[in-house]
C-alpha cells in the first residue's frame, strides 16, 4: 500500500495546503516538518493532529537547506533531548527523516522515535555524502529490531524499490517521479506513476524469485 506525505518549506502556506489535502482524504497522510525551534515544530504538530494526520515527523537534515535561509526561516540541528521533547509532545507515531549513520539511528532509538528514514535529502544538503543505499544495510543491522527503518533516494523505477527492500528497509519513499507526474498530469499523472512503479516492482519480484515484499532476500543484491 501507499500513503501520502506533506512537507514544510520556507513558504508557510505550503504546509497549510498540505494539511488541507490530508483533511480532504480523511487523515490519510503524514506531516513532515522542518527542524525549526521545538516550539515552532510543536505548533505544526498540533496543526497536523487537527488535520487528522496518522503520523508526524521532522526531516532533520533540513537543518542545512539553503532555501530555508532564503525565506528567513531559522532551522538547526537537534539533540537527543530535543527529539525526546518532540516525541513526548504527541501521541502520534514520530518519524525522524534524514538519518545517514548508525550513530544517528541509535540516537533516534534513545529518543523514543518510532520510525527513521534513511535519506540524504536527494543529495541536496551536503555534496559528496554517501547515498542512502550505501549506509542502509549497516543501519538496519544496528537498529532494525528496535525501530522501523524506511529509506529513500533515487527511486525512479519499481526495481529501485526492490533494491531498498532487499537492503532491509520496511518501506520506501518516492518523491520526484510523483511530482513530475502531478505537474504533467495532476491526479491522473500520479496514478500513472504509481501504477507503473507497482507493475515494475511486480515484474522485478517475479524475475528474482521474490514472493512477498515483506520478505525480500538480500541475496538478490550484488555488491
Mark where each language-model region is:
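Active-site entrance/lid segments in N-terminal catalytic domains of soluble metabolic enzymes
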Residues: 1-106, 110, 122-125
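Glycine-rich beta-to-alpha transition loops that act as phosphate-gripper elements at the mouths
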Residues: 35-36, 95-102, 129, 148-161
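Conserved, mostly hydrophobic/aromatic
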Residues: 58, 86, 108, 116, ...
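Short beta-strands and strand-loop turn motifs
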Residues: 59-60, 117-120, 176
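Charged helix-capping and loop-helix junction motifs
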Residues: 73-76, 130-136
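Conserved mixed alpha/beta catalytic, RNA-binding, or beta-rich assembly cores of soluble enzyme
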Residues: 120-123, 144
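Alpha/beta catalytic cores of nucleotide-metabolism and tRNA/nucleoside-modifying enzymes
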Residues: 133-223
Amino acid at each position: 500500500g501507499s500513503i501520502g506525505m506533506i512537507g514544510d518549506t520556507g513558504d508557510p502556506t505550503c504546509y497549510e495546503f498540505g494539511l488541507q489535502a490530508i483533511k480532504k482524504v480523511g487523515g490519510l497522510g503524514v506531516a513532515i516538518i522542518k527542524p525549526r525551534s521545538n516550539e515552532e515544530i510543536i505548533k505544526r504538530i498540533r496543526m497536523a493532529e487537527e488535520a487528522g494526520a496518522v503520523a508526524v515527523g521532522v526531516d532533520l537534515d533540513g537543518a542545512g537547506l539553503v532555501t530555508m535561509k532564503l525565506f528567513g526561516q531559522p532551522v538547526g540541528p537537534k539533540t537527543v533531548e530535543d527529539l525526546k521533547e518532540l516525541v513526548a509532545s504527541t501521541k502520534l507515531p514520530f518519524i525522524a527523516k534524514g538519518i545517514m549513520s548508525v550513530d544517528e539511528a541509535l540516537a533516534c532509538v534513545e529518543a523514543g522515535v518510532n520510525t527513521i528514514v534513511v535519506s540524504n535529502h536527494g543529495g541536496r544538503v551536503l555534496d559528496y555524502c554517501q547515498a542512502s543505499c550505501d549506509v542502509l544495510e549497516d543501519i538496519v543491522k544496528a537498529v532494525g529490531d528496535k525501530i522501523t527503518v524506511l529509506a529513500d533516494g533515487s527511486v525512479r523505477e519499481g526495481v529501485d524499490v526492490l533494491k531498498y527492500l532487499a537492503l532491509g528497509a520496511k518501506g520506501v519513499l518516492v518523491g520526484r517521479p510523483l511530482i513530475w507526474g502531478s505537474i504533467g498530469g495532476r491526479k491522473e499523472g500520479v496514478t500513472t506513476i504509481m501504477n507503473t512503479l507497482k507493475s515494475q516492482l511486480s515484474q522485478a519480484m517475479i524475475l528474482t524469485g521474490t514472493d512477498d515484499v515483506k520478505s525480500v532476500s538480500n541475496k538478490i543484491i550484488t555488491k
